[in-house]
Amino acid sequence: MAKEDCIEMEGVVLEALPNTMFRVELENGHIVTAHISGKMRKNYIRILTGDKVVVEITPYDLTKGRIKFRSK
């Protein structure tokens, strides 16, 4: 699957789950479970409850995603 197929949406982190997973509420009201992308993990970027994030979602499974960016 190419990167162009992914859907990017903004959301807010609701809670932190084990194994660097997060529950994120998207701007359209849907709640997804997301994990941190590899570059964020490598650079030790911390994500806390209430942070605004950009989530990549595949069209195949709209309940899971990858946190790509954390805005201030």
Curated annotation (Swiss-Prot):
Location within or outside the cell: Cytoplasm
Instruction: Output this protein's name.
Output: Translation initiation factor IF-1
Summarizing the function annotation, the protein's role is: One of the essential components for the initiation of protein synthesis. Stabilizes the binding of IF-2 and IF-3 on the 30S subunit to which N-formylmethionyl-tRNA(fMet) subsequently binds. Helps modulate mRNA selection, yielding the 30S pre-initiation complex (PIC). Upon addition of the 50S ribosomal subunit IF-1, IF-2 and IF-3 are released leaving the mature 70S translation initiation complex.
Q: Name the family the entry cites.
A: Belongs to the IF-1 family.
The GO terms this record gives for MF are: ribosome binding; rRNA binding; translation initiation factor activity
Its principal location?
Answer: cytoplasm
Identify the gene encoding this protein: infA
* Originating species: Francisella tularensis subsp. novicida (strain U112)
- UniProt keyword list: Cytoplasm, Initiation factor, Protein biosynthesis, RNA-binding, rRNA-binding
A GO cellular component annotation in the UniProt record: cytosol
**Tagged with keyword DNA repair:** no
Q: Could you tell me which InterPro entries the record lists for this protein?
A: NA-bd_OB-fold, RNA-binding_domain_S1_IF1, S1_domain, TIF_IF1
Domain S1-like: start-end pairs = 1-72
Q: Which HAMAP family match?
A: IF_1
- Quaternary structure annotation from Swiss-Prot or TrEMBL: Component of the 30S ribosomal translation pre-initiation complex which assembles on the 30S ribosome in the order IF-2 and IF-3, IF-1 and N-formylmethionyl-tRNA(fMet); mRNA recruitment can occur at any time during PIC assembly.
